[in-house]
Structure formats: structure tokens, C-alpha cells
């Protein structure tokens, strides 16, 4: 123990440096645990054992000095003052007769590590956790401001905060009682505790389900669309549903998950979105469903997929459990797409014109201003996107089908119509005819296993 309880060490400059601040005990009668916490980064032992050893060593040293001072008849007031401070902080082994001081309460921990108090908090937390299904947890410790201020005043370079120690020790106890594992990165539940006020509340972290969806019919938005008039509150226009459209991909997928998990709400995160009148075919669009405050986490994904797919309007594929960062990937990962468009032209079209169209649009840069149809909700910007490949097939004199492989974020309807010159070039400008998109399907999102990157 001599390496840490020695009062001084030699610095690189050759000067003595204080490492143990016993003087702090004159102002604050820190208990063994709290005094040891000031030097928590020294030695592999508990804070209580470390603090006890430091105090006993100093008390022994002071008692010896005082006895010698008495024998020699010299002043020992300074040593006596510190020895009394040690007695107030809980050192009751002092043998000097003129030291009769009662132990004072520790101003730092205020007894929060008392075994009975810890058990009381533990039982309270377990009672709150009973109604939830979870595997991992984290302790969130909340400390009063006056305790934080005290820590700043007495801080040493070797100290750990009382917040750290309480969270660690309480977490160990909870892990043993529940046979659950603490998890700092992705806990199912965070148990928030203020050990000073004995307040406890739970933070139920979301359950994330990732997969892909196919939208097989037109006329359904991807997410719930609030009524524009009442903004979701319910009015005569929306038949008091609060919605512009009666159903969405989000609601079709979320409903069975909410029923199975007993969650309070769900949020849908898609890798982009298709228009209401556009189908999403092929192998589907990646999505993450965020279920808020689930009570049940162990659910049968295959069974839920079967239930969703029975609807006939939406299908889900490749369902698996995800994590929070999966939903962020969508916002930062560009991906190309393949579309099928049915185009209607004002004048007759020829096979030669369609061949010209394929040639003109191959590896072509498109300059596209925000479409007029969405200007009311999006900034008027110019986007630069690229069309890589186009394949056409004639349907009749005024209709043809296009397979378009292009950058994500390109508005296909406006690529076809030209949007009164706001998209350049366009199918209309190349063919010199008025063309419109009659039907549009997303055939593939070239995401390179977007969800697996997480």
C-alpha cells in the first residue's frame, strides 16, 4: 500500500507533489467510500477499502506525531485538528484520550450506498420492470446539482464520479437479481434513478424491425397523411379520421406489430418513397419500423409477415430485428433505381423515334428544378441527376413503355412531361411531343443490401 498512501511523490521537475489531499476532510467529513473514490483510478481495489486504508495510515502517522510532540512539549494543534477531522469522517480506532468526536454524515454520498436503501431501490425498479419483456438494460443515474458542485470542488485527477459508481454497483445488483445483461450501446430499457430522492422511472427504448416492402396497388401513400384542413385532429372533410387517405403502407405494416408488441406507437422509416399512384414492385423498398415503448420484444416475424401479406395490398419480405442506426443509413446512402413507365403521347410515335429517345437519354445528365406539383412543400432548387439506360417498347400509336435506370431523386413524371421546361432534357423535348406518364412502377432499388450495412 505504500505506493499510494505515501503523501508525496517526486515530479519530473524534482519537486514534491501532493497526491492525497487529507485537508479536504477538515471541510467535508467524507466516508471511507467517498474518500477512496477521489483516488479510484489508483490500485485495483474497492473505493471503500482504498479510502479506509488511506485514513488509517494517516491516523496512525498523526497519532504517532502527537505522542512524540507531547513527550517533547511542542505544539501539535495542526496534527490534532486533522486527526479530529479523520474521527468525524468515521475513523473510530484512534486511541488518544482527547479525541472523542462523533462520526458525521458524509456530505457527498449521504448514505445512498446503504444496503437497505439499495435493496429498497432495487425492489422498486424490479416492480416497475415486471410488465416488460427485455434482455438488456442500462442504469441512468441522476445526481442533484449540489452534489455535482461538491464534486467539482473536491475533484482530483484520479477520481470517478459518484454517478459512475452508483450506476455500476446498482447495475451489478439488478443484473444478478434479474439474470439480465447491462448494455451501454443498445439497451432495451434504461432504468433512470435519482438515489438521493429515490425517484425511479423507465425509458423503454424502441424495437426496430427492418425489411423490405412491396406496394402492389396504386392509391396508397407510404405513410399516414394528415388531413390538410384539420391537420390530423379530425373534421367533416376527413370524416373525422384526421387523415387525407384512409390507409397507408405504414399503417398496414405497423398494425400487427403494435398488436404483437403492445407498443404505444410506431414510426415508419423508408429508403425514399414512391408517389401515391406508384407501385413498388421487384424485391421491394428497404424500410425500418420503429415500435415505441414495446412491452413484448420476442415476436414471431414470419407469422406477422404472413398476416401483413394476407392483406393483398402490401407485402413484406426479409424481416429481421434491427438497431437504431439502421434508420439513419437511409438518409446518408444514395441509391439508383429502375422504373417502368407507361407513356402517353399527344401525337403518334414511331419505332425510329423510340430508338432516338433511347440513344439521347443514355448516360444523360438531367437538370431538374423542383416540380411544380410539390413546390408548395419543397424548396425551389435545381437538382442534377443522371439517366444511365432507357429501354422502350411500343404499345400502340400513342403509348409506349419505358424501363428507366437512373439516379435516385430523379422525378420520373417530370422527366417524361418536361414540367413546362423545368426538367431538361425530357421525353417531351426529345420527341417534340406532349408526353405524360400514365402509370409508373418502381421495379428495383439498387441499394446493395442497404440494411445490411448497419
UniProtKB/Swiss-Prot annotation:
Entry EC number(s): 5.4.99.25
GO MF annotation, one: tRNA binding
Occurrences of domain THUMP (ranges): 100-206
Top-rank lineage group of the source organism: Archaea
Active site: 275 (nucleophile)
Residues reported to bind substrate: 339, 411
Entry keyword Isomerase: yes
Reaction catalysed by this enzyme: uridine(54) in tRNA = pseudouridine(54) in tRNA; uridine(55) in tRNA = pseudouridine(55) in tRNA
Record-level GO BP terms: tRNA pseudouridine synthesis
Keyword field contains Isomerase: yes
Top-rank EC class of the record's enzyme: isomerase
InterPro entries the UniProt entry points to: PsdUridine_synth_cat_dom_sf (IPR020103), Pus10 (IPR005912), Pus10-like (IPR039894), Pus10-like_C (IPR048741), Pus10_THUMP_arc (IPR055174), THUMP_dom (IPR004114)
The entry's keywords: Isomerase, RNA-binding, tRNA processing
Entry's family note: Belongs to the pseudouridine synthase Pus10 family.
Function recorded in the entry: Responsible for synthesis of pseudouridine from uracil-54 and uracil-55 in the psi GC loop of transfer RNAs.
HAMAP family hit by this protein: Pus10_arch (MF_01893)
Protein name: tRNA pseudouridine synthase Pus10
Amino acid at each position: 500500500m505504500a505506493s499510494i498512501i505515501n503523501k508525496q511523490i517526486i515530479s519530473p521537475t524534482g519537486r514534491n507533489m501532493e497526491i492525497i489531499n487529507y485537508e479536504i476532510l477538515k471541510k467535508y467529513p467524507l466516508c471511507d467510500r467517498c474518500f477512496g473514490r477521489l483516488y479510484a483510478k489508483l490500485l485495483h481495489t474497492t473505493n471503500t477499502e482504498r479510502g479506509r486504508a488511506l485514513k488509517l495510515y494517516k491516523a496512525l502517522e498523526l497519532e504517532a506525531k502527537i505522542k512524540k510532540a507531547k513527550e517533547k512539549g511542542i505544539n501539535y494543534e495542526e496534527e490534532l485538528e486533522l486527526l479530529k477531522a479523520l474521527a468525524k469522517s468515521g475513523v473510530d480506532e484512534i486511541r488518544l484520550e482527547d479525541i472523542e468526536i462523533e462520526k458525521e454524515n458524509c456530505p457527498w454520498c449521504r448514505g445512498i450506498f446503504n444496503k437497505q436503501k439499495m435493496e429498497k431501490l432495487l425492489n422498486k425498479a424490479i416492480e416497475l420492470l415486471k410488465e416488460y419483456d427485455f434482455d438488456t438494460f442500462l442504469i441512468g443515474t441522476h445526481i442533484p446539482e449540489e452534489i455535482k458542485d461538491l464534486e467539482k470542488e473536491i475533484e482530483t485527477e484520479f477520481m470517478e464520479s459518484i454517478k459512475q459508481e452508483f450506476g455500476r454497483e446498482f447495475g451489478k445488483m439488478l443484473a444478478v437479481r434479474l439474470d439480465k445483461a447491462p448494455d451501454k450501446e443498445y439497451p432495451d430499457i434504461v432504468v433512470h434513478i435519482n438515489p438521493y430522492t429515490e425517484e425511479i422511472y423507465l425509458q423503454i427504448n424502441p424495437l426496430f424491425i427492418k425489411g423490405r416492402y412491396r406496394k402492389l396497388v396504386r392509391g396508397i401513400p407510404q405513410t399516414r397523411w394528415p388531413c390538410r384542413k384539420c391537420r390530423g385532429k379530425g373534421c367533416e372533410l376527413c370524416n373525422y379520421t384526421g387523415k387525407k387517405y384512409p390507409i397507408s403502407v405504414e399503417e398496414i405494416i405497423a398494425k400487427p406489430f403494435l398488436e404483437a408488441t403492445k407498443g404505444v406507437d410506431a414510426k415508419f422509416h423508408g429508403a425514399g418513397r414512391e408517389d401515391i399512384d406508384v407501385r413498388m414492385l421487384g424485391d421491394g423498398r428497404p424500410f425500418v419500423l420503429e415500435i415505441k415503448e414495446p412491452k413484448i420484444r420476442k415476436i414471431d416475424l414470419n407469422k406477422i409477415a404472413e398476416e401483413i401479406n394476407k392483406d393483398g395490398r402490401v407485402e413484406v419480405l426479409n424481416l429481421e430485428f434491427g438497431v437504431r442506426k439502421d434508420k439513419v443509413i437511409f438518409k446518408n446512402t444514395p441509391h439508383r433505381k429502375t422504373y417502368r413507365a407507361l407513356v402517353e403521347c399527344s401525337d403518334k410515335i414511331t419505332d425510329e423515334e423510340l430508338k432516338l429517345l433511347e440513344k439521347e437519354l443514355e448516360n444523360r445528365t438531367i437538370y431538374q428544378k423542383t416540380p411544380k406539383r410539390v413546390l408548395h412543400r419543397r424548396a425551389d432548387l435545381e437538382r442534377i441527376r443522371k439517366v444511365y439506360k432507357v429501354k422502350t417498347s411500343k404499345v400502340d400509336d400513342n403509348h409506349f413503355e419505358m424501363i428507366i435506370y437512373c439516379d435516385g431523386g430523379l422525378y420520373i413524371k417530370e422527366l417524361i412531361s418536361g414540367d413546362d421546361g423545368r426538367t431538361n432534357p425530357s421525353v417531351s423535348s426529345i420527341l417534340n411531343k406532349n408526353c405524360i406518364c400514365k402509370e409508373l412502377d418502381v421495379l428495383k432499388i439498387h441499394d446493395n443490401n442497404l440494411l445490411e450495412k448497419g
